[in-house]
Design a protein with these regions (language model features):
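Helical "lid/coupling" subdomains associated with nucleotide-phosphate turnover
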Residues: 6, 16-19, 36, 58-89, ...
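Beta-strand scaffold of nucleotide-dependent catalytic cores
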Residues: 30-33, 45-49, 164-165, 173-175
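Conserved beta-strand/loop subsegment of P-loop NTPase cores
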Residues: 91-94
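Short flexible coil/turn linkers enriched for glycine and charged/polar residues
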Residues: 25-27, 86-89, 107, 157-159
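N-terminal basic/disordered segments at the start of proteins
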Residues: 13-44
Length: 331
């Protein structure tokens, strides 16, 4: 999935820096090349793309990054390196999250990225990940009078979910090891394949695991003080696309859409009890999310039920945008 509109690199506007941000998670790797003005908070997107690489394949079970997962990731990095060169980004920052934090052979991953992109991936903590996500998601929301404070930003990734509460800045943050890939591999896989569809026993075990993770998050983050829930990442945006019955994935219609808790519950129940073929037939469904979207939707629903949120505000701006702002600020 990519978004790029230029046959050649446009000039950098005065007061802006051209930066590239790469976010490598458990399920996907993403690139943003943008012109950023840290003084005004403006971000002019030049290229934004995502590739499903499933870097975290079997990490929860083996503790290692699989050779085929590394090669998929390096192939995407080679594609991104070409785009970064073509657009002339002055600064590049590569942030790696849950899967590479957990892997015993992450040095192999680091060496490969350095060889291809010339920058060393920062294997950041869950708390750092949460701060970047909050910055990216709330930059545009802070001037909105229709959204009450504080925000609770939830970034539902492949291996972990970040919770951040704050108004203008982060007040409290926590990362927990619950994500769409990790929950799928831990609870919905039997004999090397995702159960099609999952059993009620599997679903109940996954729900209990998610609830325990929410208990952990609440030890640090006052979840129930939130007045606006903001949801990030592919599980949330895919649920939005299903709720809107989009004929294809449409970032503009998804960004800042609002989904009611009842609608999220309806979609989650359908995803949990549907077959692979039924999920794959959804027009807006990325092929790489077909097997893991049910777990991601259940994480979102569980959060909404825990805090009593009537709706979730969906944001396409997330950790990538937060990284880009930090790069431009020289942080």
């Amino acid at each position: 999935m990519r978004s790029s509109f230029f046959a050649y690199a446009p000039l950098v506007p005065e007061g802006f820096s051209r930066v590239a941000a790469v976010d490598c998670g458990t399920n996907s790797i993403r690139l943003l090349v943008a012109d950023v003005n840290p003084a005004t908070g403006e971000l002019l997107e030049l290229d934004r793309r995502m590739t499903i690489v499933r870097l975290g394949q079997d990490v929860d079970r083996t503790g290692r990054l699989a050779p085929e997962a590394l090669e998929r990731t390096f192939a995407a990095c080679r594609d991104y390196a070409e785009t970064i060169r073509e657009l002339g980004a002055e600064k590049v920052r590569f942030v790696a999250t849950s899967a590479s934090r957990d892997a015993s052979n992450r040095d192999e991953f680091v060496r490969g990225v350095v060889d291809i992109l010339g920058v060393e991936p920062e294997v950041i903590s869950g708390d750092q990940e949460a701060e970047f996500s909050f910055t990216g998601a709330t930059k545009e929301l802070k001037g909105r009078d229709d959204l009450a404070r504080p925000f609770l930003v939830v970034d539902i990734g492949g291996g972990s979910t970040e919770f951040v509460v704050g108004e203008e800045h982060v007040r409290a943050a926590r990362s927990v090891d619950v994500g769409c890939v990790r929950m799928t591999e831990r609870h919905l896989v039997r004999d090397g394949a995702v159960t099609d569809p999952p059993t009620e026993e599997q679903i109940a075990a996954m729900r209990a695991d998610i609830e325990r993770a929410l208990d952990l998050a609440e030890e640090t983050v006052p979840l129930c003080e939130a007045r606006t829930l903001v949801g990030l990442a592919g599980s949330v945006t895919t649920v939005s696309s299903i709720a809107q019955e989009l004929p294809e994935y449409d970032s503009e219609r998804i960004h800042h859409s609002r989904i009611s808790r009842d609608k999220v519950r309806e979609i989650t129940e359908w995803l949990l009890h549907s077959t692979h073929a039924e999920r794959a037939a959804v027009p807006s469904m990325h092929p790489g999310r077909v097997d893991v979207i049910a777990a991601g939707a259940l994480v979102l629903l569980s959060i909404m039920e825990r805090i009593g949120a009537e709706e979730v505000v969906v944001s396409e701006h997330d950790i990538l945008d937060g990284i880009a702002f930090k790069v431009a600020e020289g942080v």
